[in-house]
């Protein structure tokens, strides 16, 4: 099997450790930083880092490429193994003993160009700026208006990222939906809405505000169009992986009080 290993820039040592182990059984055809430019074509991409590293690596992957993450960051929703579990991973790889999750991208079109996001796209004001009136038009429906600091449009993958911190729901990865979450809205009852993923969303503000794609500032714009992309990656998990256990252990959600 031809494998690419991509790592966070300060995790080269951990990457070399995995390369040494993996290369005993498979051909490592690429080894480098996840944020380096260029596409990666391999049978499997191994990522060393946290969720941010996985997001960068996913955009370099060809459609449908399986990816597996080794945790070397903080929360690690998109990582599946620890470095200590390398032998366990190799055994799972020999037998292809994985659970697979399909994680799809959203496509964002604006005057800044076309972008892909696995987590979310955010339009928000500068810290020193005033609140902004934002119009959100969902395909086949009339517009919604928010007077807020901004708005986040996220995938199910991104529901445990920025959207969660501003009161959005946790969405299981298998759900085919998009989440629209206003940031610090003026009206308390203005909450997140969840829509079918095949609906296009147009967001327009009264003035130029910051656009962030997967947390990375790309510039300022007034208008974006967001829709589900055809691009996707496959995240490999150990066979016993359970999403509820993950959100309970990492977020404390649904934890039993003793």
Curated annotation (Swiss-Prot):
Where is it located?
A: Cytoplasm
Superkingdom, taxonomy of origin: Bacteria
Query: Residues in the active site?
Result: 51 (proton acceptor)
Q: Which of UniProt's keywords are assigned here?
A: ATP-binding, Cytoplasm, Kinase, NAD, NADP, Nucleotide-binding, Transferase
Example GO molecular function: NAD+ kinase activity
| Biological process (GO), any one | NADP biosynthetic process
**CC cofactor:** a divalent metal cation
One Pfam entry name: NAD_kinase
Main localization category: cytoplasm
* Gene Ontology CC annotations of this record: cytoplasm
- Recorded E.C. number(s)? 2.7.1.23
Family, similarity comment: Belongs to the NAD kinase family.
Q: What does this protein do?
A: Involved in the regulation of the intracellular balance of NAD and NADP, and is a key enzyme in the biosynthesis of NADP. Catalyzes specifically the phosphorylation on 2'-hydroxyl of the adenosine moiety of NAD to yield NADP.
What protein is this chain from? NAD kinase
